[in-house]
């Protein structure tokens, strides 16, 4: 016979479980995902949207009637041969390609082979070389950028190959066809150029990564270039490592992760636009790049590794994009459900396999993603983040980009940097009422070359009182001349 005490205890447990089951998560709150123990039902007027395996979010509406693919496919376009130009063969240098900033770096110090001294509870000093020397001039900064790029490629991103020996391009209708040859191998891919402005060109354009989350409103006078980045490097989980046209050309065991392969693809698009400017009417010196979520990670890496990009526009890129590994780890250690380095390498193949050796102790890395953003400085960067999606690491992106901003400050270029973190919108749904004027100001200034609008922006609609920017960046900010 079961005692009354046992029955009472069982009823208490069942009652508690029932309360949890009946609890409803508020709008924009988390409602599921791997390891989630909180409410799985949403308040009336919202439904639980599975953003990914680890994070489900309550968003407005009643939900789709049928399952929607998260990463849509792109129909292949026919290749045409209206105009063809060929880049002359060049000797490919060994080692990673580094960003070529506008300042002549002169003779830069060699990058040491070791990781250096671990940095904990703060971010690496942008203005100190790996060997301990200080950055005191813009020429020094150019050398420091080269060093940062090499370190990122060595330990996280994988090697960016040099410009191939041959790039050919042709344009017909709205299709730009690109063929690349290197080492006896060749690949071809296409991009579509849409909304080309009428009238005398050349005109600016924004390269858009994929179609997933492609929600940025592009004003008149700016063309859009749709880039199927999955064609260059797949991102369908761990099994897609080494798959895509980049790896067809360089081998499936190449060290580059998908983000680096996509940046290489963007560089080839720029090459092709330089070759076909008379046919496309696109100005290759006035190019932006954008993407959201996973493709936002690709956008910021492309802006960092390709110096011909004038305006970088990552949207809700979170961890692996505008967020810093160290700050995400700090958030995770404080009980917040954010994506960190240990999880992200399990989800997909965005990074080099080399990165796996460091994800359990990111303090040993000689960089963080404030330095990835710094590879763009003083070129224009406008970062858009979503304060309602905790998985993105709202403190991580706020802190990381707030500290990244100091690099533009040192260069006297704060008008070229923007960070805007708002809420009340679904993941990758652009909140025009809150960020539309900011986005337009950046496009007007850096692509259309017209004045007007504020482009010195650092704001969040939420107060991050638990995080102190200065504590995480205790180093001095020089004035570089």
Curated annotation (Swiss-Prot):
GO biological process: carbohydrate metabolic process; lignin catabolic process
Binding residues annotated for substrate, in chain numbering: 297, 339, 347, 391
Signal sequence region: 1-21
Active site, renumbered: 293 (nucleophile), 427 (proton donor/acceptor)
All residue ranges annotated as the CBM1 domain in the record: 23-59
Compartments where located: Secreted
UniProt keyword terms in alphabetical order: Disulfide bond, Hydrolase, Lignin degradation, Secreted, Serine esterase, Signal
Disulfide partners: 108-143, 292-428, 324-400
Gene Ontology MF terms in the entry: carboxylic ester hydrolase activity; cellulose binding
Enzyme class: hydrolase
Main subcellular location of this protein, as a coarse class: secreted
Catalysed reaction, written as an equation: a 4-O-methyl-alpha-D-glucuronosyl ester derivative + H2O = 4-O-methyl-alpha-D-glucuronate derivative + an alcohol + H(+)
Statement: the UniProt record of this protein carries the keyword Metal-binding: no
EC id: 3.1.1.117
GO cellular component, as recorded: extracellular region
Top-level taxon of the source organism: Eukaryota
Pfam families per record: CBM_1 (PF00734), GCE_fung (PF22244)
Intervals of motif GXSYXG catalytic site motif: 291-296
Record-linked SMART domains: fCBD
Function: Glucuronoyl esterase which may play a significant role in biomass degradation, as it is considered to disconnect hemicellulose from lignin through the hydrolysis of the ester bond between 4-O-methyl-D-glucuronic acid residues of glucuronoxylans and aromatic alcohols of lignin.
Record-stated family: Belongs to the carbohydrate esterase 15 (CE15) family.
Name by which UniProt lists this protein: 4-O-methyl-glucuronoyl methylesterase
Organism of origin: Podospora anserina (strain S / ATCC MYA-4624 / DSM 980 / FGSC 10383)
